[in-house]
């Protein structure tokens, strides 16, 4: 469970201008979702495993070459993954893994929290129901998160 400070930090990554997750991910808002190219993250908890989502966030191109999600959002630093873009001052002194922070946030994401982020980003409000809209041309290898041999995480 994330602390209130960690939730705020994760929210700032999730909605950053350097990597605005909801720019591409469906939100349940029909107007937004008709152009969305990625699944609604409210569906992650019921369909995916956290370790797989973390691997996807770190290197989506390695899992599905050609996907529109970039693989350079995080970089390895001192045995942890850190956001490659600018981070707010609240991240000073935070020595934990940024990808894990974001994954934990995604797996705790609620419709209310998603609406809060959408509103803060100046978008129309998302519905309370997750949209099932997912690009069908992207094959997500091992979406249930079985770790590959040699995976140290």
Task: Spell out what each predicted region is.
Residues 7-22, 31-34, 50, 92-96, ...:
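Sequence context surrounding c-type heme c attachment/ligation sites in exported
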Residues 1-3, 73-134, 140:
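C-terminal capping alpha-helices of c-type cytochrome domains
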Residues 1-16, 114-118, 143-153:
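Electrostatic cytochrome c docking/interface patches
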């Amino acid at each position: 469970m994330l602390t209130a400070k960690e939730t705020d930090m994760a929210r700032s990554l999730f909605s950053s201008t350097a990597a605005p997750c909801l720019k591409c991910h469906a939100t349940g808002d029909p107007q937004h979702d008709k152009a969305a190219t990625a699944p609604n993250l409210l569906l992650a908890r019921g369909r995916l495993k956290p370790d797989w989502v973390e691997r996807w966030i770190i290197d989506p191109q390695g899992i599905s070459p050609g996907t529109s999600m970039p693989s350079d959002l995080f970089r390895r630093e001192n045995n942890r993954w850190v956001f490659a873009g600018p981070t707010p001052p609240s991240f000073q002194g935070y020595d934990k893994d940024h990808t894990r922070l974001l994954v934990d946030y995604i797996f705790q994401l609620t419709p209310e929290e998603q609406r809060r982020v959408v509103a803060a980003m100046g978008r129309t409000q998302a519905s309370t129901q997750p949209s099932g809209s997912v690009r069908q041309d992207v094959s997500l290898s091992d979406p249930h998160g079985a770790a590959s041999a040699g995976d140290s995480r």
